[in-house]
Amino acid sequence: MKIYLVGGAVRDSLLNLPIKDKDYLVVGATPEQMLQLGYRQVGKDFPVFLHPKNQQEYALARTERKIALGYGGFSCHASPDVTLEQDLLRRDLTINAIAQDEKGNLYDPFNGIEDINARLLRHVSDAFVEDPLRVLRVARFAARFHALGFHIAAETLALMRQISASDELNALTAERVWQEVDKSLGGPHPEVFFEVLHQCGALEVLFPEIFALFGVPQPEKWHPEIDTGVHTLMVLAQAALLTEDKSVRFAALVHDLGKALSPKEHLPKHHGHGQKGLPLIKALCTRLRVPNETRDLALLVSDQHQNVHQAFELRAETIVKIFDKADFWRKPERLTQLILACTADMRGRTGFENNPYPQGEYLTQCFLAANNVDIAAIIAAGFQGAEIKQALNLRRIEAVSQFKQKMQTKLPTDEQ
């Protein structure tokens, strides 16, 4: 029985990156032997065991055979006669198919170290096409290692296109797709994930609402990049620079879905696109089973981002209505999230990347003024029942109005 460290831990060690999880491969052992040594079996489809002391995962060497559609359509064969190389052969990328024994010796039958040095994401074998999830995984690795200069090998991208053109992607469960999206949204370059999916044809299959934005023009005055799809990924990139909040990043990604519905005769203008996008966001979130909080913020940003951009032009009554509709009184963090997404939207345009966004501070101060209205004083003044809410609303409007009067600078409208 021989034990090897495999996968991401070996790869990240060679890249001098922090190691998060360690996965081990056991060659030449049976499930019975593992149980006798105190390991606890947790894998149902194939033998995976937890170490009796540190609870790290140890998997028996195995081979796989495709028997059905989807990432789960495999028959696994685990036995003591499966070799190290046979197990590594079934892995997705060469950089993930390197093993290290207990003495520190590296085993690299598919030249993964060479590809690490060349910053290349390359498939191990043509069996790559049997697992559609690998399209998403490679896109995620491209995003994760973008700053290190990694790129996808042309022949691997060709196989990803082959998968996208088949029915395999449709066999992926919503949970697995969202899991990959969620991981990518948490990385430093989530926009690269979607760029890769667009390049290989998977975006059209899995995210048709986002795919539909590419080729849709916008006014060049406000959008020198013109293409709405390009703008969308620029906004996502800016959101990633502004915050680690994955919900804000997702909201940035889908804030302009309604622009795909603008009548061709009205292009490049997009009147009411924020509201037009709401059903598209709901459908996307339902299909992928996006968490409710993430969905709700995305809907808020789509609905209100045009108002936020034009904050200096809004009447006090309109501003308070926005605060009411979004329930910022109970969820003030939502205002911060909305402003972050709108800042990303403003900066996600060619030449606007470093511009200030005074609308954010302006709305924050409006909210503080409105939120400082003393409800106790209203009750003490003798208001009762529905009168309390009416009086509170009027005093909030007055507070915002007084703040607006103090503001001397008024920026020109910047339509997004």
Curated annotation (Swiss-Prot):
Mg(2+) binds at D21, D23. The keyword Ubl conjugation does not apply. Its EC number is 2.7.7.72, 3.1.3.-, 3.1.4.-. Residues 228-329 form the HD domain. GO terms for biological process: RNA repair; tRNA 3'-terminal CCA addition. Its cofactor is Mg(2+); Ni(2+). CDD domains: HDc (cd00077), NT_ClassII-CCAase (cd05398). InterPro entries: CCA_bact (IPR012006), HD/PDEase_dom (IPR003607), HD_domain (IPR006674), NT_sf (IPR043519), PolA_pol_head_dom (IPR002646), PolyA_RNA-bd (IPR032828), tRNA_CCA-adding_enzyme (IPR050124). GO terms for molecular function: ATP binding; CCA tRNA nucleotidyltransferase activity; cyclic-nucleotide phosphodiesterase activity; magnesium ion binding; phosphatase activity; tRNA binding. ATP binds at G8, R11, R91, R137, R140. Keywords: ATP-binding, Hydrolase, Magnesium, Metal-binding, Multifunctional enzyme, Nickel, Nucleotide-binding, Nucleotidyltransferase, RNA repair, RNA-binding, Transferase, tRNA processing. CTP binds at G8, R11, R91, R137, R140. It comes from the Bacteria. Magnesium is required for nucleotidyltransferase activity. It catalyses: a tRNA precursor + 2 CTP + ATP = a tRNA with a 3' CCA end + 3 diphosphate; a tRNA with a 3' CCA end + 2 CTP + ATP = a tRNA with a 3' CCACCA end + 3 diphosphate. Pfam families: HD (PF01966), PolyA_pol (PF01743), PolyA_pol_RNAbd (PF12627). PANTHER family: MULTIFUNCTIONAL CCA PROTEIN. HAMAP family: CCA_bact_type1, CCA_bact_type2. Comprises two domains: an N-terminal domain containing the nucleotidyltransferase activity and a C-terminal HD domain associated with both phosphodiesterase and phosphatase activities. Catalyzes the addition and repair of the essential 3'-terminal CCA sequence in tRNAs without using a nucleic acid template. Adds these three nucleotides in the order of C, C, and A to the tRNA nucleotide-73, using CTP and ATP as substrates and producing inorganic pyrophosphate. tRNA 3'-terminal CCA addition is required both for tRNA processing and repair. Also involved in tRNA surveillance by mediating tandem CCA addition to generate a CCACCA at the 3' terminus of unstable tRNAs. While stable tRNAs receive only 3'-terminal CCA, unstable tRNAs are marked with CCACCA and rapidly degraded. Belongs to the tRNA nucleotidyltransferase/poly(A) polymerase family. Bacterial CCA-adding enzyme type 1 subfamily. A single active site specifically recognizes both ATP and CTP and is responsible for their addition. Monomer. Can also form homodimers and oligomers. This is Multifunctional CCA protein. It comes from Shewanella baltica (strain OS195). The lineage of its organism: Bacteria, Pseudomonadati, Pseudomonadota, Gammaproteobacteria, Alteromonadales.
